[in-house]
């Protein structure tokens, strides 16, 4: 079961149900777990997630495009934020410090990430220094104070995970243990024909072992997609053990897939490299998860990492 937002009249619901304000129930389906992009290529917001839209507790997200000289200003309020530079260069002025020429890669397939973490109560202004500048922002409620921090490409640990055609690259932007309260953020590259988030895993219940060690966290997750060619696509399945949720989504450029619970593997179409940016928040600042026992055996069959990895590296910057 999953707790619902405090504004809901319900307290706890079966895993397959989300609460709809104003009454009624709605099952999680491919139609409400996939947010299709309406990007026109113009400046402005081209992907957006709210807790109201997702019917969950924590994650907000917006991806926006700015041309050179355009600015996006706001205040973190009672939230902690991460701004991930998808492409281009910007200047960021905040009440917690100023950051000049943030960003370097022209797009996510051409370099490692820059990002900025801001805690609550911070005013900020992001000004694009290049045309077509793109930034993805995520924010969650917080009741703690943490220092602002610029994350550079050298700060993002790179992991080549899996094996054979289940190989992928993970860049940790805000990993577990980062000086924040709830946010976790990684970006993942999956070469064409490969699987990622595989074997399927879940993080939808908070569990500790007999020694008190966390073995699974209850986390909401956003998948924000980019493909290296505009016609590319990936498939993502979200399902629970009892199949009360079993949804298959075709994800294209700038689409968002919501993972409120359940297992959630991805496969990238042959010929196209899939990128997704993951934001997570929930019961712990963690990535603790549990594999689907039906598929965990595949790990024993891996013999090596796909030679197409890494897709991006510090050498590109």
Cite the ranges covered by each PLM segment.
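A short glycine-rich, His/Asp/Glu-containing loop-to-beta-strand
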Residues: 39-73, 80, 164-221
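Double-stranded beta-helix
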Residues: 132-171, 239, 277-317
